[in-house]
């Protein structure tokens, strides 16, 4: 068999390693964290044992029964301390085993690619490797998009899919699920506890990178305590967690202090607005104009021009004059639930940055790259096709001729492709015998004649021996009208 080359213009293994560097960054970071924890654990145990030995020596040197009893107790404490230390040590060692296994599996995965690339006579191993890699991307997407609303019967779709394919060690689902869990707690449940726990474990990294996450999280905690009227706890939170940021976030702390004084006014206005919107949705007096005005006000938060000049009695609140204050408007923004979404974005940015993971879905990135290389200026245009007098002709032409196999125009990928740039080329197709019809449409003469014969054979239309039908505008032309084209 003659030696052939790969049908794919394939980049080398180093390229793939750089592209998937996070596959090794995550286990490495986990091992580093484990190592730091072990060092702290060992240092703490050494200090504790030294203290025990000092007390033991003092007790043994006393030379009396009471001292001997203390020495015996110290020995028991030393044994107990060492046993606890061994258990903690073993726990950390056990946690490292699956991490090291992941690294080994991933190294072998890229060795498979290297071996597949060497088999130039058979691209099957290379295609199998890419299929496995595609499944990893699908598993990543499913894992990232697992929500608290997912059906219990489905469990964790991403993890289940990866296990079924036998590639669970090629993706760090635990890291993705942890990030997803914290993100869901923020956006769906407005729960700060998982985030604060993660911040506490990642303080050194956040401080090293100058992150605002800890401040914003504690600021949100302070705001939620004020909303719940837990003023003492809010003040304690301010003193314990926010004051240390006075040099870097002075303006925000000023607003935090002002919010404490204005919170009751803010809550009253929020209640008034909520009541007004509720009334708009529930009230219906049968007056079409009034209903239209209420709907407009609800969606656009202002009166339509037709009634702007009419006198409307203001809400009778003694504090409404405060709303003209610029700071007061800032306080209202602090109470807006949109802050949870902003906090979530800040968390995900730092979280994925820690592990070197792309914040965007890798599957969508790869799809976007592939689609953008195929997208031309002719893509995504809705074709206008004329209807003929015969429904059967329209159906057969649509099925046999006008079927669009372009992946960019496919309804599945069109939403992704719409915002992507055009490729620096156009797709051209040369025919052996291109002809132009009088209406300007260009076709391959053989295919046009074959279509005419097919439609006549199935009795969809009556055509003369030298007549053809344009599949676009459904007009009938004679072969004598063909204009021969010459590609240049």
Swiss-Prot record:
Disulfide bonds: none annotated. It comes from the Eukaryota. Its main location: cytoplasm. GO terms for biological process: negative regulation of apoptotic process; negative regulation of gluconeogenesis; proteasome-mediated ubiquitin-dependent protein catabolic process. The keyword Nucleus applies. InterPro entries: CTLH/CRA, CTLH_C, Fyv10_fam, ZF_RING_GID. One of its GO terms (molecular function) is ubiquitin protein ligase activity. Keywords: Cytoplasm, Metal-binding, Nucleus, Zinc, Zinc-finger. A zinc finger (RING-Gid-type) spans 406-473. It holds the Pfam family CTLH. It is found in: Cytoplasm; Nucleus. SMART domains: CTLH. One of its GO terms (cellular component) is cytoplasm. Residues 175-233 form the CTLH domain. Belongs to the FYV10 family. Involved in the proteasome-dependent degradation of fructose-1,6-bisphosphatase. This is Protein FYV10. The gene is FYV10.
């Amino acid at each position: 068999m003659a030696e052939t080359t790969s049908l794919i213009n394939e980049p080398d293994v180093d390229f793939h390693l750089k592209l998937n560097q996070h596959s090794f960054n995550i286990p490495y970071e986990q091992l580093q964290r484990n190592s730091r924890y072990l060092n702290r654990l060992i240092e703490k145990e050494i200090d504790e044992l030294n203290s025990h030995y000092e007390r033991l020596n003092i007790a043994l040197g006393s030379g009396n029964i009471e001292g001997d009893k203390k020495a015996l107790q110290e020995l028991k404490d030393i044994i107990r301390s060492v046993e606890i230390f061994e258990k903690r040590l073993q726990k950390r060692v056990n946690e490292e085993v699956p991490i090291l296994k992941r690294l080994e599996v991933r190294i072998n995965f890229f060795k498979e690619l290297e071996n597949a690339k060497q088999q130039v006579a058979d691209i099957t191993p290379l295609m199998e490797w890419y299929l496995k890699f595609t499944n990893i991307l699908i598993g990543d997407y499913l894992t990232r998009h697992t929500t608290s609303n997912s059906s219990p019967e489905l469990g964790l779709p991403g993890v289940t899919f990866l296990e079924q394919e036998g590639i669970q060690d090629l993706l760090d689902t635990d890291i993705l699920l942890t990030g997803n869990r914290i993100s869901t707690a923020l956006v769906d449940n407005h729960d700060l506890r998982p985030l604060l726990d993660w911040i506490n474990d990642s303080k050194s990294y956040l401080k090293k990178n100058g992150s605002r996450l800890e401040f914003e999280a504690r600021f949100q905690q302070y705001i939620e305590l004020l909303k719940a009227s837990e003023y003492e706890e809010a003040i304690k939170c301010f003193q314990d967690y926010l004051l240390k940021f006075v040099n870097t976030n002075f303006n925000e702390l000023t607003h935090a202090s002002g919010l404490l004084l204005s919170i009751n006014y803010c809550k009253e206005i929020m209640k008034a607005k909520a009541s007004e919107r509720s009334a708009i949705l529930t009230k219906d007096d049968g007056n079409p104009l009034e209903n239209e005005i209420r709907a407009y006000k609800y969606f656009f938060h202002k009166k339509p021009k037709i009634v702007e000049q009419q006198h409307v009695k203001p809400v009778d609140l003694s504090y409404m004059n405060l709303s003209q204050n610029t700071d007061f408007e800032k306080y209202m923004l602090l109470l807006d639930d949109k802050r949870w979404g902003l906090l979530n974005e800040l968390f995900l940015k730092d979280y994925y940055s820690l592990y070197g993971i792309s914040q965007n879905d890798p599957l969508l990135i790869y799809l976007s790259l592939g689609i953008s290389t195929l997208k031309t200026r002719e893509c995504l245009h809705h074709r206008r096709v004329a209807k003929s007098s015969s429904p059967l002709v329209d159906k057969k032409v649509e099925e046999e001729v006008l079927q669009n196999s372009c992946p960019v125009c496919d309804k599945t990928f069109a939403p992704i492709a719409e915002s992507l740039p055009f490729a620096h080329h156009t797709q051209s197709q040369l025919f052996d015998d291109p002809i132009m019809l009088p209406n300007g449409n260009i076709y391959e003469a053989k295919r046009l004649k074959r279509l005419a014969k097919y439609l006549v054979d199935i009795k969809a239309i009556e055509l003369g021996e030298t007549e053809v039908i344009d599949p676009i505008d459904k007009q009938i032309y004679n072969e004598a009208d063909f204009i021969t084209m010459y590609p240049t």
